[in-house]
Amino acid sequence: ERLDEDPVALTYNSFAERIVSEHGMRIGIDPDFAMLSEAGALDLMTQIVEAWPTDLDETLSPTGVVGKILHLAGEIAEHGYTVETAREALEEFGRELEQVGRGNEAARNVIDANRRRLAFLGPIEAYQQRKRDMGVLDFSDQLVLATRIVREAPSVRAALRDEFRAVLLDEFQDTSVIQMELLSTLFGDHAVTAVGDPNQAIYGWRGAS
C-alpha cells in the first residue's frame, strides 16, 4: 500500500544525524547541537596538542601529530570503541608484543608505535571533553550517539522500523563497524538488501570489509 511513496536516500551519517537531532534528548543531547567541521576539529585539536605538557611524538611535526591523533580518534569511533576500551586493547597488545618482540627490531618499531598511540589517548579525551563543553558534535559522534539511542530506546527502534519497511544498502563493502552496529540494532531481522563488492573496499582502516 506504500508503493506510491518516493524512496528516502540517506548516507549513514545523514541518517545518524537525523536520529540524534530528533531523539537525542533521550540520552541528554541538546537537539540544537552544532556540527564541528573538519577545519574546526583540526583547530580544536591543534589547541590541545600545543598546550599538552609532554612531547607526544618526536618523529612528527606538530601538524603531523594533530593529524595522527584525529585519525586515531576517528578509528576508535568507527570501530565502536570508547577511549577506555581502546586503552585496554592497546595496553594488552603492548604486553603481548613485549613478550614476543624482545631482540626483534621490527617488533620494537611496532611497540614504539603502540606506545605513541597510547599517548595520543590523553589528547583525544581532552578533545571529547572540549566538544561536550562547547555543545558540538563531529561526524563520528553522530554514529556513536545514534547507535546508543536505538539500542536504549525501543520506541525509537519501532518507529524507524515502521517508517523504513524495506532497506537497500549500497556500497556495503565500505560499511564500518559502528555503521554495522547501528544497522544491525535497527534492522537485524528486517527486510534488508545489501549490495557491495569486497574487491572495491577502500575503508579497511575503519573496520570495513
Regions found by a protein language model. Name each.
Residues 1-72:
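Conserved P-loop NTPase-based nucleic-acid remodeling module centered on helicase motor cores
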Residues 24, 54, 78-81, 155, ...:
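Generic structural signal for secondary-structure transition and capping sites
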Residues 24-25, 103, 193-197:
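Short acidic (Asp/Glu) and glycine-rich catalytic loops that position anionic groups and cofactors
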Residues 30, 55-59, 83, 134-137, ...:
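Short, polar/charged, Gly/Pro-enriched helix-capping and turn/loop motifs at alpha-helix termini
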